[in-house]
From Swiss-Prot:
The active site is at 171 (proton acceptor). Keywords: Isopeptide bond, NAD, Oxidoreductase, Ubl conjugation. PANTHER family: 3-OXOACYL-[ACYL-CARRIER-PROTEIN] REDUCTASE, SHORT-CHAIN DEHYDROGENASES/REDUCTASES FAMILY MEMBER. Its EC number is 1.1.1.-. Substrate binds at residue 158. The keyword Iron-sulfur does not apply. There is a cross-link at residue 65 (Isoglutamyl lysine isopeptide (Lys-Gln) (interchain with Q-Cter in protein Pup)). The keyword tRNA processing does not apply. One of its GO terms (molecular function) is oxidoreductase activity, acting on the CH-OH group of donors, NAD or NADP as acceptor. NAD(+) binds at residues 11-33. Belongs to the short-chain dehydrogenases/reductases (SDR) family. This is Putative short-chain type dehydrogenase/reductase MSMEG_6031/MSMEI_5872.
Length: 279
């Protein structure tokens, strides 16, 4: 039985670990070949979040190859349009086309109110989480159009792209901006049968969330909070009785939006949020 994206090629940013790796593996499980990029070094000033590494990206490569799918992987900063374009061009040449784009790369740092956020933190956040998304799509669109078969673009936003939380205003601004990109690209690219949607996760069990800084942000009342301490507060964000979801939960949404099952779905901000938006 053919996979749900059998024979397609997907370009995924932030693919070394976390949600990006999960997306690469899930799409490969369903028959896609992968173009994967990740910066593989620290960008955020938040030292509580361990940086992705070349070894992480190499592990993603091996996982995809283990599914008998092809993968082209490079270390690329999504703020560097020329580098993005080069790897997409090369990947398309090697793999034979492009059908799916998952603009997933992102960073997180928080703790300060907006008026006390440093310019460096603001610039990094907007550069990666908003401008990087735009540059990713910009690099990929010519291949989707020239392929003549339409395509699916999925942008990773957040529930923070639909509502606000304190102490992460630069993140909130970037993720709201992603929704604007999604809607505009959907309007502009629809004539080419290219669909554009966004996914809006709540807390996800990845290093971006499961780190000392986030735990202290959730539990400032404790000196050394752990995951169980954070879960007590995190669960209060949701209607369903969980503190966070797993990367594969987001990947299943990405797979649906990438597949022909969603052939007439475009301009949709899809939440995977355990009911967070109902709170």
């Amino acid at each position: 039985m053919a996979g749900r994206v059998e024979g397609k090629v997907a370009f995924i940013t932030g693919a070394a670990r976390g949600q990006g790796r999960s997306h690469a593996v899930r799409l490969a499980e369903e028959g896609a070949d992968i173009i994967a990029v990740d910066v593989c070094r620290r960008i955020s000033s938040n030292e509580d979040i361990p940086a992705s590494t070349p070894e992480d990206l190499a592990e993603t490569v091996e996982l995809v190859k283990g599914l008998n799918r092809r993968i082209v992987a490079e270390e690329v900063d999504v703020r560097d349009y020329d580098a993005l374009k080069a790897v997409v061009d090369s990947g398309v040449e090697q793999l034979g086309g492009l059908d799916i784009v998952v603009a997933n790369a992102g960073i997180g740092n928080g703790g300060a109110t907006l008026d006390k956020t440093s310019e460096a933190d603001w610039d990094d956040m907007i550069g990666v989480n908003l401008s990087g998304v735009w540059k990713t799509v910009k690099a990929a669109v010519p291949h989707l159009i020239s392929g003549g078969n339409g395509g699916s673009i999925i942008l990773t936003s957040s529930v923070g792209g639909l509502k606000a939380y304190p102490h992460t205003g630069h993140y909130i601004a970037a993720k709201h901006g992603v929704v604007g990109l999604m809607r505009t690209f959907a309007v502009e690219l629809g004539q080419h049968s290219i669909r554009v949607n966004s996914v809006h996760p709540t807390n996800v069990n990845t290093p971006l969330f499961m780190n000392e800084g986030t735990m202290k942000l959730f539990r400032p009342d404790l000196e050394n909070p752990g995951p169980d301490d954070m879960a007590v507060v995190a669960q209060m964000m949701h209607v369903l009785p969980v503190g966070w979801v797993e990367p594969r939960d987001i990947s299943n949404a990405v797979l649906f939006l990438a597949s022909d099952e969603a052939r007439y779905v475009t301009g949709l901000p899809m939440t995977v949020d355990a009911g967070s938006m109902l709170k």
